């Protein structure tokens, strides 16, 4: 057998299939922004999903990949198994080969067998390999038995074992409906020194027989009623775990013993000064998933993907704490990770500083919570009798001490202690469901559009073109005709309208037919078709009608200008802040642009101004903006920037160059020269997540309008100051200082007023049932001063009941305040007094037993209010005496 490094095995796999005519396709991002059904990329086929569904076409019919994957959160979640088994990971690489109609079962099996057993390839012993097939898939069974010549005793049929027809470990399906088919799994026998029985038997969960490759044969389309319709072009999707095959070829039984993990575990041991194998494995696994997730744009947060990332980071930190690590250590593992991952970590290397900063910040924020929470959990477990931690205590640890429930559960599991999930389920519902809710992404391909629909886009060169209506959709239903005032989606065979993509909004305009005019308010992509969304303003529109499609030129020009400005912005940011700046999102609107990018701190005002200066310099240079079609390799050699999570599958990519300043891969529309932009102005810079900043900017006429508004504002303020604007800032500062002086004098006057009012009120105190009582009126006193008066009198007298009625002499409204010292609240309460007064005189209010308020009381006779107050107090005291 081969004994290559993991990096060499990865390349060997890709080289093998490349020699067999497969296109090597780069790994997609761990976050698929084009597939709302996925929390994370969890298999090699994810980036080809639309191809299998018939919504996308590639220029190649077979491909091979080494796909980075995450399984932590959502349907596929291996997180809690990491550290307790030899083969589960949160992050792993899936090697795969794919056929989109180029070949099927026989060729796929022959290719797999050649790679696994060929002398110049993996050279595995044939007698160590077992295979499984779906129970009724005789075709696959016979290929293994008659063409590959595997002994029949090592070919295992697996039937339906999940409670319904075609629900089996050996029958793959994308969903309840859609593409599906049988699969054949290949197992490696590690030898009888390990526990485990052959696949298909009760003992298959041991470590002796390990699945190393799954060959999926997508040959049916499952209907709503469960019937299977054969596909015209069956496909192949295979997946081999790189870490698993590396363990086989490096002659080890655990994935954590392969070269990559051995080096990472050593690095973890170095930074934690520990040798605890289980925790070292957990941390080594988690640094891979966390670093690559941050690199792909995920940041720790309280929901969605960010919550899952936070979960993984904190689990790693907790294991570090168990090893004795008290200082931040996790971020220090990014550098050794980059070293061991080789070319797979090229992007991560470019963003190393940012990734380290995000991980370090999260670790430092969590450290205090962890130490306090773990101490309290230890106290609880020490006193625990039995083997179950009750749910109320688990919730208290979270609510009071901030210890996440998943850490409580993890720690308890290590001690064979169960957590009463039913006990804390209701109280923890929101927190516990965050990751789960994040994974409930809607599964909605636009199935109403035929997968054969296709629109040719002419809008790079034309804003007006002729076309034919090929489809109409009204209320999600295909129709033959639409009429006046109906809102619909129109599909044309040719269109100049740009469909929303790449952050650029869709075009608007008009589609004119002989008998109708359709107002387009937006344009979106539906697979290979472009849908024109809008309303029929006149007449009718039918399938087959010849039409003239005309884009709103003013709006398109504004959008194009802002798109070009976005490219200038990214290059300026990378020039000023560093190459770690990577686009994390964008919105190109006709009135403004928005650009999200990776950067670990807020930009200084001087930096924002410098970015504006750089961009406006390029605008004044009036650089030519041009596009070229070339291979991806050629574009990369030119230094073209690509969108982080976008896959460029065409043999030719579109490269947009702005003079010598910017080169990017882009499919959007753009200005002809930078001078068309006119002016660039940043309206805001803010943080939207840890390590992610957002800039919003305006250009051209909108920027000029903003400058005019600011200029007018300065002019108006200057006129108020009777100033020419030359020293306006000094004038404003002088005014601020003057205001502060006046406020200080005002506070002094208020203090004097309070003292005077207290002196007057103190002479009005009477006794009622042996208790000091003050009932009095005030005029035009602010509520805050009333509260201050009450507090001061309570402090001076020690035991007193105070009710003050303040009348506003302008509107006649009366505000009341009642105060009772602590020693009297068992006899009379401020809130009871106010409640009774509101019932009598109206108004609104409330409070506590020691202080309460009422406002908006309208009365013509304040003396009546005061008289009634005295009666209330007397009654309350009498009632309290009778009760005692």
Curated annotation (Swiss-Prot):
Keyword Nucleotide-binding: yes
Single GO molecular function: tRNA binding
Catalytic function, reaction form: tRNA(Ala) + L-alanine + ATP = L-alanyl-tRNA(Ala) + AMP + diphosphate
Listed HAMAP family: Ala_tRNA_synth_B
Pfam families per the UniProt record, alphabetical: DHHA1, tRNA-synt_2c, tRNA_SAD
A GO cellular component entry from the record: cytosol
Origin: domain of life: Bacteria
Enzyme class: ligase
GO biological process: alanyl-tRNA aminoacylation; negative regulation of DNA-templated transcription
Name of the protein: Alanine--tRNA ligase
Keywords in alphabetical order: Aminoacyl-tRNA synthetase, ATP-binding, Cytoplasm, Ligase, Metal-binding, Nucleotide-binding, Protein biosynthesis, RNA-binding, tRNA-binding, Zinc
Entry-linked SUPFAM superfamilies: Class II aaRS and biotin synthetases (SSF55681), Putative anticodon-binding domain of alanyl-tRNA synthetase (AlaRS) (SSF101353), ThrRS/AlaRS common domain (SSF55186), Translation proteins (SSF50447)
Organism listed in the record: Baumannia cicadellinicola subsp. Homalodisca coagulata
Domain notes: Consists of three domains; the N-terminal catalytic domain, the editing domain and the C-terminal C-Ala domain. The editing domain removes incorrectly charged amino acids, while the C-Ala domain, along with tRNA(Ala), serves as a bridge to cooperatively bring together the editing and aminoacylation centers thus stimulating deacylation of misacylated tRNAs.
